[in-house]
Every structure is written in C-alpha cells, then in structure tokens.
C-alpha cells in the first residue's frame, strides 16, 4: 500500500541518519532443492564488537528501530523482493543459512522440497518460542500438507500473531541459538 511504502522510506532514512549503518542486510540462504540465494532484510542490528573483535550478543546490538521492525515483522518486508525474483514464496518454510545443510537429518532436509517462504507454518505455531526440532517437524508437515486453503490460514494467523505480538522473544533475550544438528528423524 501507499502507507507501507512511505513507512519503508521513512524507516530507511531514519535508520541511515541515526546509526550510519547499512539499511539492508543480505545473507546467503538455501531455497528449493538447496539452491543458494541472497535474502534481503532490513538491518536491525549494529556491528558492535567487544575488545577481542567478536560481535556482541544480539540483545546488545539491536537498535530501537530494529527492535520495532522485528517485533512487527517489518524487517522481513524487503524479502518480498525475493518473492518477486522467484526465489521464495509468500508461504513456506523460512530459509536458513547454507551452513545448516550438513546438520539436517534426512527428514528435516525435506523442507527444501519446496520454495522457502516469507511466512511459514512453524512461525505461526510458535515463532522463536519453539525448538529447532519442533520448527523442522512443522516445516515438513507443511511440505506434506501444502494447499491454497492452508496458505490462507497461515496468512491470517500471521497477521493475528503480529498484531498480538505472539511468539516473539522478549527484548532482553537473544533470538534463536544456532542450530547445531540433531539425530531426530534420520
């Protein structure tokens, strides 16, 4: 909508002015059939480091605007560019970094049988409040049950979840820990 476009423009200008950080964040992700692509998101954190040159924890790097963008899921809005390019769908398992590929069980890897999505079944069933294993089970369930009506349901649940701020990690906690692998579902 016109208002979303104006909000995006203002957010970008404000962020660039206040933080002198890049407005966009790009990261390699895996899509359907393990095809690698670059996902685009709004940058929500600084690159602050400790004395050893290591990045500080997420909670110490997230900006005020970044916190708002994450809590409202607006940081994902640039991902629609990936949808327009055909790398992602609106609905599907959230794309993850390529480094995770060797860590998936055979069953978990089935999440790559379809295009990843901006919104996923796992996100509307717990978002960051559930374990990696639970997310992957939900992703595979979606792969097996994908339908137009399920996608509509996910879209409506996502809007509800954003409005009610359900499944969002509190500001004083890091988001998800890195997925290190599992033996479930081999």
Regions found by a protein language model. Name each.
Residues 1-186:
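Conserved small/aromatic sequence motifs within transmembrane helices
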């Amino acid at each position: 909508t016109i208002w979303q476009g104006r909000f995006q423009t203002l957010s970008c200008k404000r962020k660039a002015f206040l933080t002198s950080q890049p407005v966009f964040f790009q990261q390699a992700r895996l899509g359907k059939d393990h095809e690698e692509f670059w996902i685009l998101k709004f940058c929500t954190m600084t690159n602050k480091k400790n004395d050893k040159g290591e990045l500080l924890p997420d909670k110490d790097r997230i900006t005020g605007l970044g916190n708002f963008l994450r809590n409202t899921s607006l940081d994902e809005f640039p991902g629609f560019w990936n949808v327009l390019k055909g790398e992602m769908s609106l609905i599907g398992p959230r794309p993850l970094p390529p480094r995770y590929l060797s860590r998936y069980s055979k069953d978990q890897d089935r999440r790559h049988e379809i295009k990843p999505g901006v919104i996923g079944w796992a996100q509307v069933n717990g978002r960051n409040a559930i374990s990696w294993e639970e997310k992957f089970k939900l992703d595979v369930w979606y792969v097996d049950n994908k339908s137009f009506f399920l996608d509509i349901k996910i879209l409506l649940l996502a809007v509800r979840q954003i409005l009610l701020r359900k499944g969002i990690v509190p500001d004083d906690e890091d988001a998800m820990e890195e997925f290190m692998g599992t033996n479930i579902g081999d």
